């Protein structure tokens, strides 16, 4: 696992910073990435360990490096957030430490991959449906499973944040509607990004000057950038901006008149009081409002178990939001922010993890 753009990665950073504030001595080991600087600025030591690959040589190197870190730093608790770190940590049974994990998503269990997964002494799931997945697929005892949320920094993601730097950097027109989207641009994450690119020309014919600000990097970024450039060429203007990987996600969100995305990114946009269309690779919830809260919470705003996203649904909901009056959009945005304050604070996320640590220790 690395620390590039992603919901689990941001979860780790926010949790680490909150635990550090509460007096815990925090160390983070990962393959590195754009969020390392944020950890270092918070006074958190980071170790580069190749925990992002099943390559046998690199896994052996990770095994040796983790053993050295655990022994030299006298680590009491190891908290793993992905399959490979969990597997490697689980091989250190002989060392005296407490081992816990987080389940951020549902893993592929085919081809023996199930047996690479070690959930530790206790595991904390980020939604109720992932808790059930652990019980059904791994026979994890229910008493060993805790449930938490993705805690959001409501000062960092606030309606008071300005997006003016982003407007200038990318030459956007702040007098025309802007749709923001944030995700890793990987094949298993970027379906909705591609759908937005595919509907851009159709929406351009209905909404004068509409712009799409799409943030994130990954293995399909170049392919999507090529498609976006082709759309811009046909429209003879900069309709779609592909930013690549960014750490200033709060400013990307601030620029948008509305936001499209899932999971932590959707929650961050809600915290910024933006109207949000919840859509991702696993499904489609649509325009977030009070009637969507229950289903969204059940699957951690990831849309698991919902109808699939498609171009028509996206087009209709984008048109509906952009055409809505200012009060309707403001009400949707402020309702979303209220939901974050009530259910998704960083403080609650840290409290949940501390309870697990204390029970396992």
Please place each PLM-identified region on the residue numbering.
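A short helix/loop element that forms part of the nucleotide-sugar donor recognition site in Leloir-type
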Residues: 158-172
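Short His-centered aromatic/hydrophobic patch
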Residues: 80-86, 103
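A conserved, positively charged/aromatic
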Residues: 70, 94-128, 139, 253
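Nucleotide-activated donor-binding/catalytic signature segment of Leloir-type glycosyltransferases, i.e.
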Residues: 223-246
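N-terminal strand-loop element at the rim of the active site
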Residues: 1-6, 10-12, 17-58, 217-223
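A short, well-ordered alpha-helix in the C-terminal region of glycosyltransferases
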Residues: 320, 327-343, 355
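Conserved donor-binding/catalytic core segment of Leloir-type glycosyltransferases
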Residues: 172-193, 197-201, 213
